[in-house]
Amino acid sequence: LNEENTVEPEERDASTPSPVLIVPGHLFFVDRINLPQALESSEIDDFAELSLENLAPFPVEQLYWGYLYSKSAGSILLYASYKERIKAQGYQHIETYLWVLPDFATLFGAAFSDATTLQLEGDESFSRITFAAEDSLPQQIISSPEVQKLEGEHAPLRLKLESTEVN
């Protein structure tokens, strides 16, 4: 990669990790997984990791991954990306971050009274996100580096991501 394609965090004391690195959503695999009814809240972390181990072609240690959970949804939204894929995009000093998240995770907790489809536009990614009425976990997320791949039906709500520093 040349220097023009390199994304670097602001200079900071290496002993103080930055909390969050937000990267384009299209770099992540996403799956909504129903939770077994008998599953206790304390078991969700283990369930998510086991689910990921069954789905991912790479060991969990080689992934940036996480999940979104809403108690009322009865499911989790599992997301993962191969660490080398993120590094290949030019992100440097990733180890200084506590979390590496897809841009669509910034909408966690959003809920709409009616079924809603929105388009989240970042600098390098476009995500079409579909919510069922009153559900804070998306039913579906389709992300792409090109907006043309997501066009078709009209997304009634468009949101533009702005770069921000999270401290």
Predicted regions and their residues:
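Hydrophobic/aromatic-enriched cytosolic interaction surfaces used to assemble or bind macromolecules
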Residues: 1-167
